[in-house]
UniProtKB/Swiss-Prot annotation:
This is CDGSH iron-sulfur domain-containing protein 2. GO terms for molecular function: 2 iron, 2 sulfur cluster binding; metal ion binding; protein homodimerization activity; RNA binding. The chain crosses the membrane at residues 38-60. It comes from the Eukaryota. One of its GO terms (biological process) is regulation of autophagy. It comes from Homo sapiens (Human). Its main location: endoplasmic reticulum. PANTHER family: CDGSH IRON-SULFUR DOMAIN-CONTAINING PROTEIN 1, CDGSH IRON-SULFUR DOMAIN-CONTAINING PROTEIN 2. GO terms for cellular component: endoplasmic reticulum; endoplasmic reticulum membrane; membrane; mitochondrial outer membrane; perinuclear endoplasmic reticulum; protein-containing complex.
Amino acid sequence: MVLESVARIVKVQLPAYLKRLPVPESITGFARLTVSEWLRLLPFLGVLALLGYLAVRPFLPKKKQQKDSLINLKIQKENPKVVNEINIEDLCLTKAAYCRCWRSKTFPACDGSHNKHNELTGDNVGPLILKKKEV
C-alpha cells in the first residue's frame, strides 16, 4: 500500500507537476514571468535551493570553536571555588594588579598573561588594578 503510493507519486504526479511548471526557454524568459507563474515556481525553486544547500554544506568551513571554553584551566582545581583574600591594609605598594584571566604564573598577581589569552581567544580581559587614593 505504501509503496504503491510512493510509486504513484514518483511515476505519475511528480512528472505531471514538473510538466505544468512555467519554466522559460531562456534566462531572459524569467523576466517575462507573471506573479502567478513565479508563485507556481516558488515551491520547486525552494526544494532546489534546499537540495543545493544540503549538497554544499559538508564543504562549508566549520564554525571556529574557541580554543578553551573553561576559564580556569590549572589554578587550584582541587577546590570547588577559588577565592583569594587580600587585606587592603597590606597593600604597601601604591598600585597592585591582580589576575582576572586565570593564566598568570604568579596568581593572584597579574603577570601580563592575559595579553596572550586575549590574542588567542579574541577576548578582552585585563587585570584588576588596585591603587591607593592620593591625598
